[in-house]
Structure formats: structure tokens, C-alpha cells
């Protein structure tokens, strides 16, 4: 566990999945950094393989950002409605809880995605192909094979030809609205899954100019937030301490730490991915300014 300090993705232990058409390696960045709720991972899917059996979470939104490669998003609401969509670098996918069952299929060059999940309270996942429910470490019906093995026994997943028009839940970053601004050393140029309708998850990319900060020093009372560096360098500022960041660095901050944090961008700029959950009632505290924000647009002294 990182004790609230940055880690590098390559240093996080890899978990291997190989079951029939499923062939992928997962690095659980959130777990390695002590996340309480957020599930964050980098998943490398082998060429021509799937990431998982098709599945739908009962109470957990998921979002994916394609970091490298290309492939297909497989989605189904039932046996009479099965679709695939082409996906590639910088595509953003949002899967609301209890929505279409989905999985990812890599193309001939493989597929690497950054996956973010808000965290489930029930750990219930439905797998329509095997007609099973995953219940945390167990599954139902209890007398059936484990879900990955059960999926493999069904043989290849039938794939329809890709649909040209993609749904509103799949967008390239370049298609999303750019929210940008600069005030002193604070700067942002953000494209965010919230512009696709997400109200429980943040998954946003910022093109940060050299020498800027992503925010004032702050901490949240209820939210977890995290950052992944796609390119460039800088430092993770934690109170008076500074920790280096480079491409592949990951940093997660738990809620209510009492210590302010921010990203300070180096001279080459930074492509920064910001992730987090959206918790009602969260208060953002700015210890240097001695102010807090109990609601959007309202900042008060303390």
C-alpha cells in the first residue's frame, strides 16, 4: 500500500486472466494505493481476446479510457439486442449501473484501457451469457462452475458487425466540450465523462500547460480522487512535501485526510487524467486559504 503517495503503474502487481476467449492482465492501481471505494485499474487485453465475460453491475457505474490499441465494445440488453462498436485511442466509454451487459474485445494490436468504477455496495454483477450472478467472492447458482470457466465453456462469443453510429455513452475526447481557464498559476483544459451524462463518476483528461497547478491545495471531506499521468512530468504536492510524477504515475487521495494536495506541472507540461467519485454532501477544504466550499459556487472562510 502506498500510504497516500504516488506509485508507478509498472510497479503494481499484475493479475492475469486466461479463460477461453478472455485473455487480459490487470493492474489494480486503486487497491495498491489504499482506495476505500474507487476501483481503478489499467487493463491490457491480448490481441483478439476479451477483457471479461459480458456483465452488468447492479449498483456501480464504470468508465473506460482507451490508452493504446483498438478493438470493439460489445453491448447487449438481451439476446435480441446485441451490438458492437469500434473503439480506439482517446475513446471514453461510460457504463451506468444496471445497464447493458458489456465487455471489451481487443483488435490485432491489443487494447489497453484505464478503468474506473465508483465502488459497489452489494458486489452484485449479472452475467447474462452464463445466466449467473457474481456475489463478491461467490456466485449463484452456487452449484455451477465459476463464472469465468462457465463463460469459456460456452465457446466463442458471437459478434455482430460493428455499428457505425456510436451511442452517446461512447465518445472520443476530441468530441467532448472543452472546459478551459487560467487564473495565475491555476489552469485547466478539461474533457470529462460528466458531459456524457455521468453523475457518479469523474473521468477527465486535462492538457496542463507547463508550470501550472491543477488546483489550490485542498482535501475533500467525502470524495476519493486520483490522477494518472499519460505524459509529461511534475510533482504531487502533499502539504509541504513534494513527490515526483512522470508518465505512468498514479496518485490517489482518500477522503478527509486533513492535508492539502495538488498537482504541480513541470516545464514540459502534462497530460493528466483525473478520476473520482461524486459524493453528495462533500465539502472541499482549502487549508492555505483557510476557506471551504460546502456547495458549488459558495466559498466561505473558516
Where are these regions (language model features)?
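Short histidine-centered beta-strand/loop micro-motifs
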Residues: 31, 52-57, 75, 85, ...
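Short, conserved beta-strand element in jelly-roll/cupin
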Residues: 42-46, 56-75, 118, 205-209, ...
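Short acidic-glycine-tyrosine-enriched beta hairpin
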Residues: 77-97, 240-257
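Ligand-binding loop in jelly-roll beta-barrel domains
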Residues: 97-123, 255-282
